[in-house]
């Protein structure tokens, strides 16, 4: 009973469907309204109305309903019976970036009413933003130059305000930030300087748009040496399983296009299994080598593979230098030796319309195979056919689809009718096959339309494309006289073209068949992809449709041409770069050394790259569940219905008109039949799918191949979210070698032309130039990459060591390379100089014959005579000669007949460098004040090494201001030392700003140093927000409490000047807070750098005072809970100190006094200062404090040594405590501070710093605050005179206009006595620096050093050019252990360290860091005790040097710099006269 009832309901539903058709056939009005499913604000959008068989006037209304209300889009009165019209409307900008709304379409007449709603996505019109950098890879310390480009989707420039941009390092630290960036005509050019030691790896430039979306661009920071040449590797893409030999061609070419002399090593390895073949060969005259590598033994013996992959690597080694460069490639060994590629095969078929198939047969190299049989089989039809490929390897088939009963069509195409190697374990070649599946298009009446186009072709812009439309119409067409086909073209989500075609129907024609052509203009607005929909409405209301996608050429309307005035230029010559673009275009130019792109290839800025940007993509809109569409009627499923009315039961793979419309990105409002009948079950609507037909197992295994063209093997990054002189040059002196040559913005004139005159850099290379132009009329334009070869017909290269010691001799070599096809008579000259003697080696120095494409090396044995920097100028000149050059006549090039290279050599005195600085602050009123000074030298001084100069400056910070990045004569390799490069810039900026002396030049320089220091300090940050000496990359398990507090206060103070990511400050503060105990004191984490901070004082007390001070200097109020508890800790600690009156707590008391002063607790500050006064040392008009115990001095001093780091630091804290008095320091505070300042200035070194890092930072803070409080602009001049007991005398005038100027004079008498006199009004800072070298002598020192070379003697032939240096170090001073220690190993002249062996030392437990500078190896040791530490590394000869002098090893305590020791080592062959 229930089943019978169910069947009746189903039949009733079917009848309803037929009644609906009948009603439409009887003349009811038909409506079809099409609108894009995604609508954009502030831009014209179209909605297309198709109203058919109207019998009355109607009004069409469209409105958009959102949570904010209803927006009426248009009201259109329709008077015509039939209407096909598109109406434009504009949606105002949304407050959010997008929202899902309902679009309502209402059609109302006197007797008719149609109303429907559909969900649409409304989006604000978005900009397209991308970033271009001047190059893809940077060295530490270089400037990152980049452009932000902003356009609309039509690629027109936008003047856009971008709220935020920043640079992110590999650790996700935000190291630089900009806000509110305004692009002008679509462009904004910016730059950022990297720190000298940044984190290396991938960096990101991130740009935020107003919508909140962000665009990213990546670049890499790494240490590198630019490759001088490139390696081109050619291997076949694929080979047959029967091939025994792999042909490999490797070529080495210099960046200026000439072949590389040398040899090549080729390695061929299988991917999945072990086994390689290596072949070595010499490069030929073209720089190439082709090798046939036998691979039979490498091929896999397994039988179950389809493809084997072989990796090929070619390493070219340059002759003479040993420089290497590699290139890799892959080749596939395949069992299928030819391929069939589908060029045409639609995804769907239509019953009754032929299904067209076009394939191409290609061989394993991708070349077409003509005159070969190709077989096709269609499983559903039991259809087979064969044809022969034409000359292009093409084969075409047409399959009659009339008799297909199912919903799918499975096709297989074979090269051979039967494959003799179809079983699994076959090792023979297999023949090509390809498969394709097409599914049916749904039509109730079996009527269809089909658009025929070559989908594989790319349509060129600004042309007409013809589309053939085929149709077949069945069913009851009545007395239909004509049929109108309507079409729409969409691109970028909008309707851009519409049209129609009318077909006249012949009386009695059944079925109606035909075809017609549509001509579609290919417009720029269609790039890169357009979709076309065609449909017609049959008399019964059924709609039939088809669609096709067009891939459009990625063209740009702004045609940009870039060219150099010549394709090849001499280095240092003038050239012109000419840009042609749309008038008034703004163009960004770039030219980069090709070597940079060899090192790290990048995606070329091209139209394809632009159209792949995220902002250019069109995503499909799927409504959310809350905006689901109105429920559709459905037919209740029954087996009876399925059996009796199969034409009414669709399969899930069939495609209806609704899907065609949806795939176009359209939404349809209609009362027509465009959708498959939905089968509904008792539990709801479910579309039914027919069982999928599985392909015959005989078709497997197979590989499907798609049409593709490989343009280059070079790896690319994925798309990103990234006037010339007419006079020939006769001589060039080359010294300018940039990596980026051109990075500029120019505007083309009204005729569309711009010319830039520029000088070609000195690098002999190929420059790659490109232009990006933006026009308000034509939008974006890109030039192709334009090369300029900077090349000389011949040039000279000079090699010499970085430095030598006086008395040593070395071989200076000059190699001349001739790349002309003719020979030249050459003359090579080393310019004479009184600074050295040079003896030619060989008898061809004056003149020799240099053959075509040849090279020749001339040598001189050079012995320097002067100390310091010595210039060597080598010139190579082609000369006129009547004598034949070999069998040829010698030629002289028209341009560039002379090449000159100037190089500098540092000549150092032998022995150990010593420096003494005598600094004084003179404050004169009216009476003249004077001071005597004696310069004396030790008996072991090295002859002629002494030099001295006297400096006068008008400001207390002048020296430090000039040397903010060189305050110490020490390395800066750890997190604490780096802060001396950072913090002093804050004090300098504050001081100069308060005293109104800040110039733009000083400000720019200081801000640059702050940004670099900020970047570098992030290297030492731990994941928990703390900081340590060497960061967490060296395995340090915990951060350092003291350093974290130091970084916290410095970052907080720097916020006033540069961008500091607030998260770094917050994380550091949180970590410190977690270290606070219940009593308010702080637990120590990590070791103290300077154990003088202990000095009999409770570590926790001193550390807590320092952290409290740092928190207060970070602008935290004294009432903050953490600070308040910390101050309670200090008050308790002060009580303990008062009770222990016999102990000395000078360092801790100085810190506490400053902390209480910062907190505003004047009483406690005064108490502590009074206690300190009792321990003060008052002498020579100065007041200072000393430590109770001092470390043992390492030698007898000629001069009173500088105070230790801790003593400078605690005296500076006393000054800061006095100057921080509230509301202002009293006259007594200023007077007492002045007395301590006098003592502090005498401790300064020649660069304005002090003994070490922390004392330099604190003392400069004190000096800057004192200078600001006491600053005055005197109208009078201060006169400074220095005179010797002999005839020397020099006067200096200091006034407001030259306060910051360094005035200096060399002192002639060493040894000698001098008098310094100061008269006038005001304070001046005077400094004398004495430097000399002294011979190493045995002395009592705080360290024991033992140095030895391995081998010890020259008996081992390796001792000539490479040997090991072994060191043993122990501490012999008065303390249990040293502070951090630096072992500074100077290189022998002409030798360089083998970097991997130095880096390997960092694996040792006691080595924290190593550095390799120009001429030194620095080894950082955590601390040294009486236990001997041993380590070794290897050095190798770079340039031969004769009469090698010993090199010095210096070991010293970083914070107690008078604790040091020296040793020396010699080459095992130092006395070997054949060392050169």
UniProtKB/Swiss-Prot annotation:
Residues 677-734 are annotated as: Bait region. Residues 710-729 are annotated as: Disordered. GO terms for biological process: embryo implantation. This is Murinoglobulin-1. The keyword Signal applies. Glycans are attached at residues 55, 294, 313, 500, 749, 776, 871, 993, 1142, 1180, 1426. Gene3D superfamilies: 1.50.10.20, 2.20.130.20, 2.60.120.1540, 2.60.40.1930, 2.60.40.1940, 6.20.50.160, Alpha-macroglobulin, receptor-binding domain (2.60.40.690), Immunoglobulins (2.60.40.10). It holds the Pfam family A2M_recep. There is a cross-link at residues 974-977 (Isoglutamyl cysteine thioester (Cys-Gln)). Plasma. It comes from the Eukaryota. SMART domains: A2M, A2M_N_2, A2M_recep, Thiol-ester_cl. Belongs to the protease inhibitor I39 (alpha-2-macroglobulin) family. Residues 713-724 have a biased composition (Basic and acidic residues). PANTHER family: MACROGLOBULIN / COMPLEMENT, MURINOGLOBULIN-1-RELATED. A proteinase activates the inhibitor by specific proteolysis in the bait region, which, by an unknown mechanism leads to reaction at the cysteinyl-glutamyl internal thiol ester site and to a conformational change, whereby the proteinase is trapped and/or covalently bound to the inhibitor. Monomer. It is found in: Secreted. Disulfide bonds join 48-86, 251-276, 269-288, 461-555, 587-773, 634-680, 849-885, 923-1323, 1081-1129, 1354-1469. GO terms for molecular function: serine-type endopeptidase inhibitor activity. Keywords: Bait region, Disulfide bond, Glycoprotein, Protease inhibitor, Secreted, Serine protease inhibitor, Signal, Thioester bond. Residues 1-27 form the signal peptide.
């Amino acid at each position: 009973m229930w089943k019978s009832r169910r069947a009746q309901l189903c039949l009733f539903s079917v009848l309803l469907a037929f009644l609906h058709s009948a009603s439409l056939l009887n003349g009811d009005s038909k409506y079809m309204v099409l609108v894009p499913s995604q609508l954009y604000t502030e831009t014209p959008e179209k909605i297309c109305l198709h109203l058919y068989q109207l019998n009355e006037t109607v009004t069409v209304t469209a409105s958009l309903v959102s949570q904010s209300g209803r927006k009426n889009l248009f009201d259109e009165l329709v008077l015509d019976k039939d209407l096909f019209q598109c109406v434009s409307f504009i949606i105002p900008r949304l407050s959010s970036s997008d929202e899902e709304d309902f679009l309502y379409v209402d059609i109302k007449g006197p007797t008719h009413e149609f109303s429907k709603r559909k969900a649409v996505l409304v989006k604000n019109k978005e900009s397209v933003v991308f970033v271009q950098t001047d190059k893809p890879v940077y060295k530490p310390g270089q400037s990152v130059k980049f452009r932000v480009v902003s356009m609309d989707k039509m690629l027109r420039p936008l003047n856009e305000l971008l709220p935020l941009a920043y640079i992110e390092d590999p650790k996700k630290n935000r190291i630089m930030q900009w806000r509110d960036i305004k692009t002008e005509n679509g462009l904004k050019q910016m730059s950022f300087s990297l720190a000298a030691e940044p984190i290396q790896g991938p960096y990101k430039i991130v740009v935020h748009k107003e919508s909140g979306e962000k665009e990213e661009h990546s670049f890499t920071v790494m240490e590198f040496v630019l490759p001088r040449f490139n390696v081109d590797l050619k291997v076949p893409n694929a080979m047959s399983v029967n091939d025994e030999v792999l042909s490999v061609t490797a070529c080495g070419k210099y960046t200026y296009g000439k072949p590389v002399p040398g040899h090549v090593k080729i390695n061929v390895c299988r991917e999945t299994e072990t086994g390689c073949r290596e072949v070595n060969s010499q490069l030929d005259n073209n720089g190439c080598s082709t090798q046939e590598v036998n691979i039979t033994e490498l091929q896999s013996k397994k039988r179950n593979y389809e493809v084997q992959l072989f990796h090929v690597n070619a390493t070219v080694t340059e002759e003479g230098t040993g420089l290497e460069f590699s290139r890799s490639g892959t080749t596939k060994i395949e069992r299928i030796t030819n391929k069939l590629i589908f060029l045409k095969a639609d995804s769907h078929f239509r019953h009754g319309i032929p299904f067209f198939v076009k394939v191409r047969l290609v061989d394993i190299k991708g070349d077409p195979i003509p005159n070969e049989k190709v077989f096709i089989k269609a499983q559903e039809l039991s259809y087979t056919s064969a044809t022969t490929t034409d000359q292009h390897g093409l084969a075409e088939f047409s399959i009659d689809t009339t008799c297909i009963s199912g919903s799918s069509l499975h096709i297989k195409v074979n090269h051979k009718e039967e494959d003799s190697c179809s079983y699994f374990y076959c090792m023979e070649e297999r023949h090509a096959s390809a498969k394709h599946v097409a599914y049916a298009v749904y039509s109730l009446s079996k009527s269809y339309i089909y658009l025929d186009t070559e989908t594989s072709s790319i349509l060129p812009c600004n042309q007409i494309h013809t589309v053939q439309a085929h149709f077949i119409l069945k069913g009851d067409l009545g007395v239909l006289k004509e049929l109108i086909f309507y079409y729409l073209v969409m691109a970028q989500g909008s309707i851009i073209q519409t049209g129609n075609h009318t077909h006249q129907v012949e009386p009695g024609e059944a079925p109606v068949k035909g075809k017609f052509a549509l001509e579609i203009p290919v417009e720029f607005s269609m790039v890169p992809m357009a979709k076309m929909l065609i449909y017609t409405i049959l008399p019964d209301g059924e709609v039939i449709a088809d669609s096709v996608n067009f891939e459009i050429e990625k063209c740009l309307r702004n045609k940009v041409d870039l060219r150099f005035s010549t394709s090849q230029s001499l280095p240092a010559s003038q050239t012109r770069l000419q840009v042609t673009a749309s008038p008034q275009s703004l163009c960004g130019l770039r030219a980069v050394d090709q070597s940079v792109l060899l090192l790290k290839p990048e995606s070329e800025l091209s139209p394809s790259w632009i159209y792949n940007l995220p902002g250019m993509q069109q995503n499909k809109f799927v409504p959310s569940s809350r905006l689901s569409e109105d429920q559709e009627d459905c037919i209740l499923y029954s087996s009876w219905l399925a059996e009796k009315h199969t034409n009414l039961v669709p399969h899930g793979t069939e495609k209806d008109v609704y899907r065609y419309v949806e795939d176009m990105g359209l939404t349809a409002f209609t009362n027509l039949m465009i959708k498959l009948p939905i089968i509904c079950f008792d539990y709801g609507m479910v579309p039914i799918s027919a069982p999928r037909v599985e392909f015959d197992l005989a078709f497997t295994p197979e590989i499907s191949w798609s049409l593709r063209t490989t343009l280059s093997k070079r790896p690319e990054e994925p798309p990103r979210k990234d006037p010339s002189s007419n006079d020939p040059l006769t001589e060039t002196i080359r010294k300018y070698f940039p990596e980026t040559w051109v990075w500029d913005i120019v505007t083309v004139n009204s005729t569309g032309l711009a010319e830039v005159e520029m000088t070609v850099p000195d690098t002999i290379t190929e420059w790659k130039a490109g232009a990006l132009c933006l026009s308000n009329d034509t939008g974006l334009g890109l030039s192709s990459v334009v090369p300029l070869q900077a090349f000389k017909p011949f040039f000279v290269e000079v090699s010499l060591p970085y430095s030598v010691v006086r008395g040593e001799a070395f071989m200076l070599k000059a190699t001349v390379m001739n790349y002309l096809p003719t020979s030249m008579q050459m003359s090579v000259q080393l310019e004479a100089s009184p600074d050295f003697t040079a003896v030619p080696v060989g008898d061809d120095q004056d003149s020799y014959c240099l053959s075509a494409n040849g090279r020749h090396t001339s040598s001189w044995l050079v012995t320097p005579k002067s100390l310091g920097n010595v210039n060597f100028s080598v010139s190579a000149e082609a000369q006129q000669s009547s004598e034949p050059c070999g069998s040829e006549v010698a030629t002289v090039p028209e341009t560039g007949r002379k090449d000159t290279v100037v190089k500098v050599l540092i000549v150092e005195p032998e022995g150990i460098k010593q420096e003494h600085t005598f600094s004084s602050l003179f404050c004169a009123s009216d009476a003249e004040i004077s001071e005597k000074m004696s310069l004396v030298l030790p008996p072991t001084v090295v002859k002629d090494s002494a030099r001295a100069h006297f400096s006068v400056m008008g400001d207390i910070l002048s020296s430090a201001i000039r040397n903010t990045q060189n305050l110490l004569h020490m390395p800066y390799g750890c997190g604490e030392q780096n802060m001396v490069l950072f913090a002093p810039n804050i004090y300098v900026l504050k001081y100069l700003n308060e005293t109104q002396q800040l110039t733009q030049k000083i400000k720019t320089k200081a801000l640059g140093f702050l940004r670099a220091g900020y970047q570098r300090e992030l290297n030492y940050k731990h994941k928990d927000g703390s900081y340590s000496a060497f960061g967490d990359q060296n395995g340090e398990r915990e951060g350092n409490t003291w350093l974290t507090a130091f970084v916290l206060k410095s970052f907080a103070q720097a916020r006033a000047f540069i961008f500091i990511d607030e998260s770094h400050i917050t994380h550091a503060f949180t970590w410190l807070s977690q270290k606070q105990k219940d009593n308010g004191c702080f637990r120590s984490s990590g070791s103290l750098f300077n154990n003088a901070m202990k000095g009999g004082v409770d570590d926790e007390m001193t550390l807590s005072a320092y952290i409290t001070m740092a928190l207060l200097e970070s602008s935290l109020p004294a009432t903050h809970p953490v600070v308040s508890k910390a101050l309670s800790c200090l008050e308790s600690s002060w009580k303990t100190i008062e009770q222990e009156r016999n102990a000395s707590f000078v360092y801790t008391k100085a810190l506490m006094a400053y902390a209480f002063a910062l907190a505003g607790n004047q009483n406690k500050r005064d108490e502590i200062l009074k206690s300190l006064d009792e321990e003060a040392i008052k002498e020579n008009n100065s007041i200072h404090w000393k430590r109770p115990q001092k470390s043992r001095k390492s030698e007898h001093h000629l001069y009173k040594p500088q105070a230790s780091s801790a003593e400078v630091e605690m005296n500076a804290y006393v000054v800061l405590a006095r100057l921080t008095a509230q509301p202002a320091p009293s006259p007594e505070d200023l007077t007492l501070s002045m007395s301590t300042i006098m003592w502090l200035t005498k401790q300064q070194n020649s660069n304005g710093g002090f003994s070490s890092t922390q004392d330099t930072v604190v003392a400069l803070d004190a000096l800057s605050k004192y200078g600001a409080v006491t600053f005055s602009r005197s109208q009078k001049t201060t006169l400074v005179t220095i005179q010797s007991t002999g005839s020397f005398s020099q006067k200096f005038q200091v006034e407001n206009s030259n306060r910051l100027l360094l005035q200096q004079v060399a002192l002639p008498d060493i040894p000698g006595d001098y008098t310094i006199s100061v008269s006038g009004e005001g304070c001046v800072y005077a400094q004398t620096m004495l430097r000399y070298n002294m011979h190493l002598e045995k002395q009592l020192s705080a360290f024991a050093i033992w140095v030895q070379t391995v081998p010890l003697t020259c008996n081992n032939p390796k001792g000539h050019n490479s040997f090991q240096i072994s060191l043993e170090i122990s501490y012999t001073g008065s303390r249990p252990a040293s502070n951090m220690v630096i072992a500074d190993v100077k290189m022998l002249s002409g030798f360089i360290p083998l970097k991997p062996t130095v880096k390997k030392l960092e694996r040792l437990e006691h080595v924290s860091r190593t550095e390799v500078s120009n001429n030194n190896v620095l080894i950082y040791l955590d601390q040294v005790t009486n236990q001997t530490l041993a380590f070794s590394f290897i050095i190798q000869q770079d340039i031969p040097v004769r009469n090698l002098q010993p090199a010095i090893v210096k070991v010293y305590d970083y914070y107690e710099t008078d604790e040091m020791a020296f040793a020396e080592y010699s080459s095992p062959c130092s006395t070997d006269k054949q060392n050169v």
